[in-house]
Amino acid sequence: MTAMNPHIDRTGQRERQLAWLTVATPAVGTVVALVLAWHQGIGWLEIGALASMYLLTALGVEVGMHRFFSHHAFKAGPVITAFFGIAGSMAAQGPILFWAATHRQHHAFTDKEGDPHSPRPLKAGFIGNIQGWWHAHLGWLFSLRKQNWSQFVPDLLRDRLIMQINQRYYLWIILGLLLPSLACGLITRSWEGALSGLLWGCLLYTSPSPRDKRQ
């Protein structure tokens, strides 16, 4: 039996930990928000924070990550490119290269061997269907995969601006946390408002996932 490369093993562990954090944070945020809403109610501040950040990141994912970076459905200058790259990254669905490479690979092998999030069951019967459903929705995020960027996104690798945005992925996530927190904190002039903005504008919203795009 061949031992796994320690570097690859550590990288896989970090990726799985990040995947759990990405999946668990909105789930926990939703529970906390619902409990607080039940006991304290919600106002226009919370609704505004949720709607604003959802629309911003959904635009970044739907138009940016999907139509622009993955499919080149239109052309854009550096300002628009940066806007879509940053807005899409704030959704915390992965850096530009990861998102586009995964989506292009999905289209190249749709529901076949090589599709990173195919729902086709590996086993027959009810259990196999459940496993396929789980893998298509969340399980694929925890699978250790060799990076395929040079095969599926060579055009993005040659773009200096896109590479700079991609390399600062975690900075954009932090920016997505700070924007609604600062805005709500300044509006209310209170730490409570800032925390409310953090919860409703960051930890609650979820944007459409790459697996949902079929075109």
What are the residue ranges of the model-derived segments?
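Single conserved hydrophobic/aromatic residue that forms the stacking wall/gate
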Residues: 205-215
